[in-house]
């Protein structure tokens, strides 16, 4: 088949503009890189290289106009790496036949359907079609592959241009010898613009440098088959390396899918777009190695099938032609940055004339070009690499047959595969090598000069490398390496191509005209630099995998979309094509899968070949590195030996200097020697340090620091490297030259020889006469610089003569020849000229000559003086060597002294070392003895502690057998829960194996000194512990029996409290005195309490809050009264907020008990004490009182009176109030005479274990006494796990539970209460607003991490206050920024004067301030004008004429009088118009006599009667009807009121007033104004300082009728009008003033803060607002807890704005108001929100009517929040309780909440036990009170800072710094602080944290109910303290003053 007649089977070829001959010529030229004439003979077989067939992709220049962009689809360059989606399109859609219309066939109808999917391979069927090969080389004009030629910039699609321009074809190529343009434009893929370049060298690159699908230079190029709309390629098994051809490439394709025919209906859109944008990376299914192919023998066969003329027409190397404007190669070569030449790699050299044997035909697979030169050559070429053959200017001539092409050396080494596909199909995956690594760029050849030709000498110098044969499949690949074609770098070839070839100007517009230069060179260089940067960037492997996965996912999606699109398009175009489209899709899919497998094989072969090529070079490089490392090691050893020798010498010098210093008696000499010894010692230490640690890094390669020429001392350079400066002496200029070591040694030897000669009595040898140095000095003036230019070194050392370079030339003596004068000079030879000339010379001789002579003389004397000084100095310098000869004797003496000093130093050092060793041995013995003693003491203390714990365990064991607390705890109302928990517990978990005593009870051990814990064995200690436990039990029972010794025992022998031992197993029923019904768990709790009472043992009832601890305590009192006739006295001590609750509960449940509410003033309490009967220890039913209820504060204040009473039972509610054993409360209550004590608490552990120890010590002081060991075990040992953040020892926890069991009973709600609803806790996270973030960041920036760490570790109490202050500021920011600064009401600048008063006391209760503002500008009128006749109309004594005018002119002669009007109304008189104006005479007279405002008011009230009349007579016949009395009132008669005014209701009103309705609906009248005036002022007034003036002014301003007329009646008046049923006729008229535009602001400019902005300024408040709306809609009632009273104030404003009812209870609420407030909330369902402070509302009150609890800010102590939420979740609550906790995300609140959760977990584990002990508990949230700084600092610090604090604390602990600080502070201070903490005088962490809430304890109760009596144990009871002067107030008092709870 003819090449020109071959067409696609689907699409017709578009017509071209050239004839068939021209097409044939262009096809011949299009055959890329044909073989040289000498190699294209029959024997060559069409092969271009000696070693292999011609590749389908070649190294042809991209500057050729017919360069096919299909072949450049794998054109991989730096520009294509960043080309974007267009590049992806160009590179991913090639080779699929088109089935769409011919209008889109210009770029896609290249081949038939048998072409390959954008793959360089074809199926086997294509090899047998020669016409196919011919069709591959059609010209772009005939194949339609290129769009109309335009400028190489980025253009719109071809559809954008007209049909004429699209059908226009490019002109024929320009001659090759045309000079290149100075500037050229290229497409910039980074900025999507066309960039102009002026440097042709930087812009033009070869096809080898810009494409990576090249083979040998003489190979024939076969363009790739295109099928544009096939599916995506599949990724290769081994992905391509990230750096192909030295450039960076992303491992994943672009995210843009290829264009489909369905999505792009334009006819030539894709055809125009393809050559514009450079192609992208190669297809993903093949590595870049495969995409650098060479052709197979089938391609060779294709080229052989062509005509001989075709072969002859193609030169050996394709010349560089002028690029077409829109050729893809032009764009691509222009867009690539300037290449950097690479070093050449060694290649195999062969004879160029050797012809390879033709290979058999095979599949036309495209194989990568051969690249054996991966590694750089051993000797990089110093000459620039020659250009390739196809770049040679003469390469198109047949006269160059010997010049072989050079293959690029920069592509991948596996770039050429000549193996058959069938040969390598069976290659194993394991044999495939890894992808190559990116090579280093070589920049050495970058600046080489350009060379136009290839140098043959350079080829001969190539290193010959023997091929390495591999077995099997590698045989063919290794044969390829025998190619004789020399290789060169692509980069270098690209540069040479740019040098050797010229190009036509590429700056052209769309019409073909030359485009003006518009871009700068800097822009192109910036793009090139950006591309190079992209090349050097590395891609992370994880990112590559992620991109690969994303690309695979997009590929599958795109495949599905394309399948659907193809089917839909085919079905729409022609239904019959549907099956064909489906078959085509299957064929493409199968073929692409097959090609993937084949390409994978070639990838493996390429990798193996790469290993073959680079193995020797790599081995050589490794050997060189090893050799270099060995050399460096030897050098290091030499340096080490030199340093050791130097150190030894330096040490000897140091010892010698020290010996001399000790021996000498001269103080200055000794100091000098000591300094020398110190320097030597320092030098030796430095050398020793270097020898030990070594110099880090290659110190030998580090250059010394830069020379400091600006002064200072540096030891890294010599002085002669500096510029000459000022000398040290006055007569010295510059520094003395530094002598070398040889010179110094020579001088020293000469001096020693001279000294020896003198000592021997010989004469000194004569000094050798050196040639004198003559310095010739010009007599003329020399500069100082030239004087200093004499080389001093030359003068000293070299015997050379220095001559002045500026010696004046000798004067020539001879006859003076008179010169010929100029004509201009002869012109001035006149008499006048000569006179002037002579005068000038005379003046110079008289004035200037003497001056010049003096200057010359001074200069001469100065020079002579300098020369004399120089000569003297030189003489001194010359004689200096003679002075040195006298130093020999001195050196000998000094040497002797030095030896003596060295000996003394040695013996002293020896003695000192012996003495130090002896002392060290003694210290070690003492230390060992101290350690042994410490170990013995620790063992003793451990045994003592074990003894104490065992004693307590035994006591608990004996009591527990009688009390059976464990059974009571396990028995619940929910047996299924208890059974499940019991099942989870191991058998005998807390069982204590105790051998019961059988003999008599042993003696109690009270003095621990009697026990020898070292000698005693365990059995003796166990027996002592058992004896102590039994004695403790007996003692408790004895005390219980002997409590009332005065009472006689019951004769009947009834079981009462005196004989209680028989009640251990008795089941107690509910007392009948109790009116309520106890629940099962409450009845069991009563049994437990009664058993404790019977045994005389105190206990702790620690049930969870809300389970009825109060009713159980009351039932105990009822039981004692009913069964044992013990009616008291009972003492109940409770917090002040629960006193009323206790009184109500006792009256309600046991009304027979008489109550004394012991609170109030001192006189009230005195009266109440009269009811106390101190004579009897037990009360009967008829006693005056049975129960006394008081508060903790009252107990402390009246401790003397309480101690006199004997209390049967003392109940302490909320017993955590006595958590400190050092507090006055604890001591006072412990001193009371009580038979039994009962502690009620829901949280036995709030902060630390010391609190639990205080409670246990309180209930059993005889057992839990103040032994330090036991206290330490409770607080320190257990809490040491908090410091180490470790797990709590399970054995210790078990022993702790065993101790607590008998004395403490605790049940939780989920076990005992079935009907109680669930409690759900939710954390609601809020974000900071912009204002809050700004505040928070400012506060954060003020914190210094170092200060924070220091205060956290070593801080004192003052630091605690500072840190807590920071915490408070952060909490304020999180709550609301208005806590810092409120948004105030604002107004314009008021330029007014306000009224002032001297004293409000004289003003009365009300002060009138109306119209008291005055303008700053006043119009002052004198009284003469205002009052004394100034106003002519004002009658007075000074103006008698005013009455005359008023009388005669205003009354008698007034024309508006009724008489005058009546006389003038007839006929044509003046007032005759009245009868036609509907006006009566009286109305006319009234108009003339009333003022303007009255007339306006009257007119506003008058109704238009004529308009209504006009409506009544509105007939066609009576159009002109007009009443006779209203002929002149034309406007009133025709005045029809608009419908919008008369329609005031109904739908018609909205329709007729659309604008008004829309204005109202848009809420515009109530919006805040966007702007306001800058200033305001009242109007200017006339001011006259008289009383009459003020009266007249007030008469106008306070004119009530005028105000009513202007503003109308107010709301109250309107309401009264309706209530009084005022007739409509009597209602006042509408106001004359219009309504204000803004209803909120009205007529004022004062701006009130917006509540909406108030809500949105806080993230918490905004979230709370949203939450409250939902709760209100759901019918819930809310308890809202705060920790700052100021925040409660803000919340009150918010609730008022929302119009929700609320009530408030906080620390400032009076004691008598608390009960009423709680009662109102419980009984009034309309109250939606109850505002409480966490501490005030968390104790004892019942708020079960609420079912929602919201914590606006959480507490750092979880027990406080638990108490607060249990106000609603307690007995009586029937609904589910939901607890919301607002937490600001990423702030201090999150860390406070985290610490609180840790603390809560600790409490759960310690009290309840369970799984927490084994799972590990984080105790890091708890610290001792003295370490509270750390707790606060942990809130402030983030995670990194917290780690630093802990690390610093560990360092201080290890170094003992903490102990030193503790000792420094002193133990007395700690005791005082502890006492203050207990008494309340100090500030605890709780009080500091809640400083914004006020006081909530009993220290301050408002009102007269409970006065404030200070807590103090120091003052004796009954005595008052003396009044002192002004005393500094505590922090607590200052807070109380700030909250208004305390007076100043």
Swiss-Prot record:
GO terms for cellular component: Ino80 complex. It holds the Pfam family SNF2-rel_dom. Residues 73-83, 312-323 have a biased composition (Low complexity). ATP binds at residues 1103-1110. Component of the INO80 chromatin-remodeling complex. Residues 356-382, 429-464, 740-751, 782-791, 800-815, 966-986, 1887-1900 have a biased composition (Basic and acidic residues). It is found in: Nucleus. GO terms for molecular function: ATP binding; ATP hydrolysis activity; ATP-dependent chromatin remodeler activity; DNA binding; histone binding. Residues 1090-1262 form the Helicase ATP-binding domain. Residues 84-98, 139-149, 208-223, 289-307, 327-336 have a biased composition (Polar residues). InterPro entries: DBINO (IPR020838), DEXQc_INO80 (IPR031047), Helicase_ATP-bd (IPR014001), Helicase_C-like (IPR001650), INO80/SWR1_helicase (IPR050520), P-loop_NTPase (IPR027417), SNF2-like_sf (IPR038718), SNF2/RAD54-like_C (IPR049730). It comes from Pyricularia oryzae (strain 70-15 / ATCC MYA-4617 / FGSC 8958) (Rice blast fungus). It catalyses: ATP + H2O = ADP + phosphate + H(+). It comes from the Eukaryota. Belongs to the SNF2/RAD54 helicase family. SMART domains: DEXDc, HELICc. The keyword Transmembrane does not apply. The DBINO region is involved in binding to DNA. Its EC number is 3.6.4.-. Residues 840-965 form the DBINO domain. A motif (DEAQ box) lies at residues 1213-1216. Residues 1663-1818 form the Helicase C-terminal domain. This is Chromatin-remodeling ATPase INO80. The keyword Disulfide bond does not apply. One of its GO terms (biological process) is DNA-templated transcription. The lineage of its organism: Eukaryota, Fungi, Dikarya, Ascomycota, Pezizomycotina. Residues 1-518, 715-815, 966-1003, 1862-1944 are annotated as: Disordered. ATPase component of the INO80 complex which remodels chromatin by shifting nucleosomes and is involved in DNA repair.
């Amino acid at each position: 088949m003819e090449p020109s007649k071959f067409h696609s089977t689907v699409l017709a070829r578009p017509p071209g503009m050239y004839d068939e001959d021209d097409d044939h010529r262009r096809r011949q030229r299009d055959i890329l890189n044909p073989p040289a004439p000498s190699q294209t003979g029959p024997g060559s077989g069409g092969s271009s290289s000696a070693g292999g067939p011609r590749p389908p992709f070649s190294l042809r220049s991209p500057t050729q106009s017919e360069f096919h962009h299909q072949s450049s689809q794998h054109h991989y360059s730096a520009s294509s790496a960043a080309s974007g989606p267009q590049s992806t399109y160009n590179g991913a859609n090639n080779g699929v036949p088109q089935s769409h219309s011919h209008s889109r066939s210009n770029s896609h109808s290249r081949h038939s359907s048998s072409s390959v999917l954008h793959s360089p391979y074809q199926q086997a069927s294509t090899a047998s079609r020669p016409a196919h090969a011919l069709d591959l080389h059609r010209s772009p004009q005939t194949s339609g592959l290129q769009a109309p030629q335009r400028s190489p910039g980025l253009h719109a699609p071809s559809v954008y241009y007209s049909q004429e321009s699209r059908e226009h074809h490019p002109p024929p190529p320009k001659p090759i010898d045309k000079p290149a343009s100075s500037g050229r434009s290229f497409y910039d893929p980074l900025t999507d613009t066309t960039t102009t370049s002026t440097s042709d060298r930087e812009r033009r690159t070869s096809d080898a440098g810009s494409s990576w699908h090249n083979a040998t230079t003489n190979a024939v190029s076969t363009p790739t088959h295109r099928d544009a709309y096939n599916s995506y390629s599949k990724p290769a098994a081994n992905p391509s390396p990230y750096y192909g051809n030295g450039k960076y490439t992303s491992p994943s394709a672009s995210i843009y899918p290829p264009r489909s025919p369905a999505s792009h209906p334009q006819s030539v859109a894709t055809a125009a777009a393809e050559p514009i944008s450079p192609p992208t990376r190669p297809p993903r299914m093949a590595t870049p190695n495969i995409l650098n192919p060479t052709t197979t023998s089938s391609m060779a066969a294709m080229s052989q099938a062509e005509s001989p003329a075709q072969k002859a027409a193609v030169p050996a190397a394709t010349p560089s032609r002028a690029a077409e404007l829109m050729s893809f190669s032009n764009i691509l070569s222009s867009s690539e940055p300037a290449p950097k030449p690479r070093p050449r790699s060694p290649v195999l050299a062969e004879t160029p004339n050797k012809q390879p044997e033709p290979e058999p035909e095979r599949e036309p697979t495209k194989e990568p070009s051969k690249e054996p030169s991966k590694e750089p050559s051993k000797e990089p070429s110093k000459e620039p690499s020659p250009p390739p053959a196809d770049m040679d200017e003469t390469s198109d001539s047949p006269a160059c047959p010997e010049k072989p092409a050079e293959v690029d050396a920069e592509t991948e080494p596996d770039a050429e595969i000549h193996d058959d596909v069938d040969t390598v199909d069976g290659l194993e995956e394991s044999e495939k090598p890894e992808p190559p690594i990116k090579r280093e760029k070589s920049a050495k050849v970058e600046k080489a000069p350009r060379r136009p030709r290839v140098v043959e000498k350079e080829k001969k110098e190539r290193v010959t490398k023997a091929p390495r044969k591999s077995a099997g499949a590698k045989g063919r690949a290794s044969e390829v390496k025998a190619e004789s074609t020399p290789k060169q770098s692509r980069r270098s070839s690209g540069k040479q191509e740019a040098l050797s070839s010229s190009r036509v100007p590429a700056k052209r517009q769309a019409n073909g005209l030359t485009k003006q230069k518009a871009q700068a060179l800097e822009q192109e260089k910036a793009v090139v630099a950006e591309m190079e940067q992209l090349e050097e960037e590395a891609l992370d492997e994880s990112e590559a995998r992620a991109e690969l996965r994303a690309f695979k996912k997009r590929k599958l999606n795109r495949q599905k979309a394309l399948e659907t699109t193809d089917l839909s398009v085919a079905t729409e175009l022609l239904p019959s094509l549907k099956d064909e489209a489906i078959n085509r899709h299957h064929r493409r899919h199968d073929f692409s899968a097959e090609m993937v497998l084949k390409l994978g094989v070639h990838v493996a072969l390429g990798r193996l070949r790469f290993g073959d090529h680079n193995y020797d070079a790599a081995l050589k490089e490794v050997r060189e590195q090893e050799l270099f490392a060995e050399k460096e090691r030897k050098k290091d050893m030499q340096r080490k030996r030199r340093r050791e020798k130097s150190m030894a010498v330096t040490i000897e010098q140091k010892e010698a200097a020290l010996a001399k210093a000790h021996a000498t008696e001269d103080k200055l000499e000794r100091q000098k020697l000591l300094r020398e010894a110190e320097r030597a010692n320092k030098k030796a230490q430095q050398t020793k340090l270097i020898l030990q640690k070594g110099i880090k890094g290659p110190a030998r390669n580090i250059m010394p620091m830069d020379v400091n020429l600006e002064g200072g001392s540096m030891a890294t350079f010599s002085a002669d490297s500096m510029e000459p400066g000022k000398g040290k002496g006055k007569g010295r200029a510059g520094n003395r030259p530094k002598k070398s070591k040889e010179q110094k040694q020579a001088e020293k030897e000469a001096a020693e020889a001279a000294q020896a000669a003198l000592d021997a009595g010989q004469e000194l040898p004569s000094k050798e006469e050196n040639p004198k140095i003559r310095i010739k000095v010009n007599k003329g003036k020399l500069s100082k610089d030239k004087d200093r230019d004499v080389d001093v070194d030359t003068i000293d050392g070299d015997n050379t003569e220095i001559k002045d370079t500026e010696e004046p030339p000798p004067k020539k003596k001879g006859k003076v020849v008179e010169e010929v004068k100029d004509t201009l000079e002869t012109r001035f030879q006149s008499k006048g000229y000569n006179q002037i000339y002579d005068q000038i010379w005379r003046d110079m001789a008289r004035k200037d000559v003497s001056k010049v002579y003096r200057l010359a003389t001074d200069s001469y004397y100065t020079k002579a003086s300098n020369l004399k000084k120089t000569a003297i100095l030189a003489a001194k310098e010359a004689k200096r060597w003679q002075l040195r000869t006298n130093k020999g004797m001195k050196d000998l003496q000094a040497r002797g002294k030095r030896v003596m000093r060295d000996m003394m130093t040695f013996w002293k050092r020896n003695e000192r070392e012996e003495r130090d060793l002896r002392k060290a041995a003694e210290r070690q013995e003492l230390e060992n003895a101290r350690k042994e003693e410490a170990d013995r003491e620790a063992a003793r203390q451990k045994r003592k502690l074990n003894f104490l714990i065992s004693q307590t365990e035994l006591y608990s064991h004996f009591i527990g057998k009688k009390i059976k607390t464990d059974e009571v705890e396990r028995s619940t109302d929910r047996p299924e829960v208890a059974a499940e928990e019991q099942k989870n517990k191991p058998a005998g978990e807390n069982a204590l194996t105790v051998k019961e005593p059988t003999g008599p009870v042993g003696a109690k051990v009270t003095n621990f000194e009697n026990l020898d814990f070292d000698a005693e064995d365990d059995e003796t200690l166990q027996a002592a512990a058992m004896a102590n436990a039994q004695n403790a039990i007996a003692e408790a029972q004895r005390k219980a029996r002997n409590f009332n010794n005065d009472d006689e025992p019951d004769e009947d022998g009834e079981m009462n409290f005196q004989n209680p031992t028989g009640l251990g197993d008795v089941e107690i029923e509910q007392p009948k005195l109790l009116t309520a019904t106890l629940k099962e768990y409450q009845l069991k709790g009563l049994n437990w309490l009664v058993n404790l009472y019977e045994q005389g043992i105190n206990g702790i009832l620690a049930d969870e809050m809300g389970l009825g601890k109060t009713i159980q305590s009351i039932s105990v009192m009822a039981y004692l009264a009913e069964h044992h006739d013990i009616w008291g006295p009972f003492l109940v001590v409770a917090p002040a907020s629960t006193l009323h609750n206790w009184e109500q509960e006792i009256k309600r449940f046991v009304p027979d008990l008489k109550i004394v509410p012991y609170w109030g003033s001192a006189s009230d309490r005195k009266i109440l004490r009269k009811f106390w009967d101190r004579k009897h220890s037990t009360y009967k039913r008829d006693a005056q009182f049975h129960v006394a209820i008081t508060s903790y504060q009252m107990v402390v204040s009246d401790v003397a009176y309480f101690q006199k009473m004997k209390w049967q039972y003392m109940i302490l509610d909320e017993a955590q109030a006595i958590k400190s054993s050092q507090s006055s409360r604890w001591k006072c209550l412990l001193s009371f005479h009580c038979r039994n004590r009962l502690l009620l608490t829901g949280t036995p552990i709030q902060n630390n274990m010391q609190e639990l120890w205080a409670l246990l010590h309180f209930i059993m002081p005889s057992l839990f006494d103040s032994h330090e060991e036991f206290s330490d075990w409770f607080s320190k040992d257990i809490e040491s796990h908090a410091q180490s953040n470790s797990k709590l020892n399970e054995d210790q926890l078990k022993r702790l539970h065993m101790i607590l069991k008998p004395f403490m009973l605790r049940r939780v709600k989920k076990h005992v209460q079935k009907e109680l609803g669930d409690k759900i806790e939710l954390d609601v996270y809020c974000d900071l607003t912009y204002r809050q973030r700004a505040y928070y960041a400012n506060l954060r920036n003020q914190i210094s991490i170092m200060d924070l760490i220091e205060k956290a570790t070593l801080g004192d109490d003052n630091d605690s206050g500072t840190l807590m202050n920071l915490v408070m500021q952060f909490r304020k920011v999180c709550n609301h920024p208005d806590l810092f600064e409120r948004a105030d009401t604002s107004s314009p600048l008021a330029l007014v004067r306000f009224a002032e008063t001297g004293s409000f006391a004289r003003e009365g209760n009300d002060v009138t301030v109306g119209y008291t503002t005055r303008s700053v500008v006043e119009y002052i009128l004198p009284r003469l004008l205002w009052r004394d006749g100034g106003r002519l109309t004002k009658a007075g004594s000074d103006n008698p004429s005013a009455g005359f005018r008023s009388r005669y002119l205003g009354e008698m002669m007034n024309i508006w009088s009724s008489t005058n009007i009546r006389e003038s109304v007839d006929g044509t008189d003046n007032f005759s118009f009245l009868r036609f104006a509907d006006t009566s005479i009286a109305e006319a007279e009234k108009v003339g006599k009333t003022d303007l405002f009255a007339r306006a008011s009257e007119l506003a009230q008058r109704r238009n009667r004529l308009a209504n009349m006009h409506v009544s007579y509105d007939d066609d016949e009576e159009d002109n009807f007009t009443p006779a009395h209203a002929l002149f009132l034309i406007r009133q008669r025709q005045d029809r009121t608009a419908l919008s005014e008369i329609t005031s209701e109904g739908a018609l009103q909205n329709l007729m007033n659309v604008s008004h309705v829309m204005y109202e609906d848009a809420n515009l009248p109530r919006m805040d104004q966007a702007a306001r005036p800058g200033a305001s002022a009242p109007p200017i007034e006339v001011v006259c300082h008289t009383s009459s003036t003020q009266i007249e002014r007030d008469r106008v301003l306070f004119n009530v009728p005028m105000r009513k007329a202007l503003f109308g009646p107010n709301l109250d008046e309107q309401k009264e009008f309706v209530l009084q049923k005022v007739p409509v006729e009597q209602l006042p008229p509408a106001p004359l003033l219009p309504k204000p535009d803004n209803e909120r602001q009205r007529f004022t400019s004062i701006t009130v803060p917006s509540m909406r902005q108030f809500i949105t300024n806080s993230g918490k408040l905004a979230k709370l607002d949203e939450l409250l709306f939902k709760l209100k809609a759901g019918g819930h009632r809310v308890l809202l807890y705060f920790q700052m009273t100021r925040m409660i104030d803000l919340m009150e404003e918010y609730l008022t704005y929302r119009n929700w009812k609320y009530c408030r209870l906080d620390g400032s609420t009076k004691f008598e108001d608390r009960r009423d407030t709680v009662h109102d909330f419980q009984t009034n369902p309309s109250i939606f929100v109850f505002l409480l402070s966490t501490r005030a509302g968390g104790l004892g009150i019942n708020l079960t009517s609420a079912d929602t609890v919201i914590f606006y800010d959480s507490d750092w102590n979880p027990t406080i929040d638990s108490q607060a939420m249990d106000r609603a979740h307690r007995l009586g609550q029937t609904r589910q309780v939901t607890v919301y906790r607002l937490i600001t995300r990423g702030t201090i609140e999150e860390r406070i909440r985290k610490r609180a959760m840790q603390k809560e977990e600790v409490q759960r584990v310690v009290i309840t036990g369970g799984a927490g002990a084994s799972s590990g508990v984080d105790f890091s949230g708890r610290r001792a009170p003295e370490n509270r700084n750390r707790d606060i600092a942990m809130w402030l610090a983030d995670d990194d800072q917290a780690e630093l604090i802990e690390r610093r604390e560990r360092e201080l602990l290890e170094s003992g710094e903490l102990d030193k600080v503790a000792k420094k502070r002193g133990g007395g201070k700690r005791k005082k602080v502890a006492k203050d903490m207990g008494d309340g005088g100090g500030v605890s962490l709780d009080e500091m944290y809640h400083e914004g809430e006020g006081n909530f304890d009993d220290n301050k109760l408002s009102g007269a109910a409970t006065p404030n009596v200070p807590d103090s144990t120091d003052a004796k009871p009954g005595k008052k303290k003396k009044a002192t002067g002004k005393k500094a107030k505590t922090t607590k008092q200052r807070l109380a003053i700030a909250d208004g709870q305390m007076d100043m």
